[in-house]
Amino acid sequence: KTGTITEGKPRVASIRWYHKEAKHYAPILTALEERSSHPLASAIVSYLGVADSSEIEVSSLHEVAGQGLEAEVAGLRYRIGRSTFISELTPLTDEVQAGLEEGARLGATASLFASEEGVLALILITDSLRPSSKAAITELQHKGIEVIMLTGDGPASAKTIAQAVGI
């Protein structure tokens, strides 16, 4: 899907902070994402922009393929990634679940940022559809070719995008 149906240029649509001290946690989120190899990490760093992470000491960082990353900052464990990965660290509140469902309806990829103390932020990332995608898929279907879409996105997000282009 990425780069074929969509433009392959992910951008952060929004960050919903669940903690009143967002100014404290934004530099930590930036520091972790600067060290990530995930393709969406640079979109998050760009969105946060001015969050100064130079003083943040990150230790024990490791990435779990397809799930997210975990690290320690000032003795506290943090995670960024899929909801299933985050829920192993801390429970997901009804408010967070509602945010995840909203993101899926919008066709966004959702990433959660959490500490052992709870979910700190919901990050919604989108990638614009290529203007030619729907027409190209329709043309293939008219030629009798069955079109399927492969994606690492969650089922709800994938369904939204597939419906938008006629798959």
Regions found by a protein language model. Give the residues of each.
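Cytosolic catalytic headpiece
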Residues: 2-167
